[in-house]
């Protein structure tokens, strides 16, 4: 289980640039406080780095 990440959206998408909203959608997050489990790959890490201020990673 160490090669997976629990990603939670903790900040609203209102007023964010379209690029950030696209990254959130690419991670599979839809609403505030939703959580998804994704594999720990460089692609996912890159997406997380772009919107790290909006996420909680466990």
From Swiss-Prot:
InterPro entries: Ribo_uL30_ferredoxin-like_sf, Ribosomal_uL30_bac-type, Ribosomal_uL30_ferredoxin-like. The keyword Lyase does not apply. GO terms for molecular function: structural constituent of ribosome. GO terms for cellular component: cytosolic large ribosomal subunit. Disulfide bonds: none annotated. Pfam families: Ribosomal_L30. One of its GO terms (biological process) is translation. Keywords: Ribonucleoprotein, Ribosomal protein. Belongs to the universal ribosomal protein uL30 family. NCBIfam families: rpmD_bact. Part of the 50S ribosomal subunit. PANTHER family: LARGE RIBOSOMAL SUBUNIT PROTEIN UL30M (PTHR15892:SF2), MITOCHONDRIAL RIBOSOMAL PROTEIN L30 (PTHR15892). This is Large ribosomal subunit protein uL30. It comes from Pelobacter propionicus (strain DSM 2379 / NBRC 103807 / OttBd1). The lineage of its organism: Bacteria, Pseudomonadati, Thermodesulfobacteriota, Desulfuromonadia, Desulfuromonadales.
């Amino acid at each position: 289980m160490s090669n997976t990440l629990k990603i939670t959206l903790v900040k609203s998408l209102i007023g964010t640039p379209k690029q950030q909203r696209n990254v959130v959608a690419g991670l599979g997050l839809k609403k505030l406080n939703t959580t998804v489990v994704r594999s720990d790959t460089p692609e996912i890490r890159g997406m997380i780095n772009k919107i790290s201020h909006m996420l909680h990673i466990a």
